[in-house]
Curated annotation (Swiss-Prot):
GO biological process, one term: ribosomal small subunit assembly
Keywords for this protein: Cytoplasm, Ribosome biogenesis
Family annotation (SUPFAM superfamilies): YhbC-like, C-terminal domain, YhbC-like, N-terminal domain
Role: Required for maturation of 30S ribosomal subunits.
Subcellular location: Cytoplasm
Pfam families attached to this UniProt entry: DUF150_C (PF17384), RimP_N (PF02576)
Gene3D superfamilies in the cross-refs: Ribosome maturation factor RimP, C-terminal domain, RimP-like superfamily, N-terminal
Provenance organism: Caulobacter vibrioides (strain NA1000 / CB15N) (Caulobacter crescentus)
Family: Belongs to the RimP family.
UniProt protein name: Ribosome maturation factor RimP
Gene this chain is encoded by: rimP
InterPro entries in alphabetical order: Ribosome_maturation_RimP, RimP_C, RimP_C_sf, RimP_N, RimP_N_sf
One annotated Gene Ontology cellular component of this protein: cytosol
């Protein structure tokens, strides 16, 4: 789900090491548009850490990753024709594109769409219940104590739902990130 097309997946394979070398993870990559007005959209973030920090990117992070990605793309020239590069944070109501996302955000509300009918439907909304093997767990909204599991391979779209709990978690992540950034700044001033 990080890339929809083979071209997207090839670009992810090329650019993952670039992002990782800078301390970021590519959440999603999409090369959109036809032969004209193409746009390469990359969503990235800092990895989530045990202390709750990470997960977001600021403008400086986006610019840093954009410059590094541009250098690699200019050298390899894997995209035919002109295109615009956009690097951004996935945002608070982010897409869930990797199996680990369903574990990292367990306990939060999400919308999930499958590529096939399961439990009589393709679309679900509920609280993420984590991961078991390659199965994504969801406590279905409106159902009493019903948790269903779907193979991750069936998921074609998934996104967190904006809730108070999500806003609170986002605020905690930003606070932890600011604290970490301030510690890094203090250490560099001491040097």
């Amino acid at each position: 789900m990080r890339g929809k097309t083979q071209e997207d997946r090839d670009l992810i394979e090329m650019l993952d090491p670039v992002a990782e070398s800078l301390g970021y993870e590519i959440v999603r990559l999409r090369l959109m548009g036809g032969t004209e007005q193409r746009r390469l959209q990359i969503m990235a973030e800092h990895p989530l850490l045990e202390d709750g920090s990470g997960g977001d990117m600021n403008v400086e992070d986006c610019a840093k990753l954009s410059r590094a990605v541009s250098e690699v793309l200019d050298a390899a020239d894997p995209i035919a024709g002109e295109y615009t590069l956009e690097v951004s944070s996935p945002g608070i109501d982010r897409p869930l594109t990797r199996l680990k996302d369903f574990d990292d955000y367990a306990g939060l509300e999400a919308r999930i769409e499958l590529d096939r009918v399961a439990e009589g439907r393709k679309r679900f909304k509920g609280e993420l219940a984590g991961v078991e093997d390659d199965q994504v767990g969801l406590n279905i909204e409106g159902e009493d104590d019903v948790t269903v599991y779907f193979p991750f391979a069936w998921v074609i779209d998934a996104k967190l739902v904006m809730t108070d709990a999500l806003m609170e978690r986002g605020a905690k992540q930003r606070a932890a990130r600011l604290e970490s950034d301030n510690e890094d700044l203090s250490e560099s001033e001491e040097d």
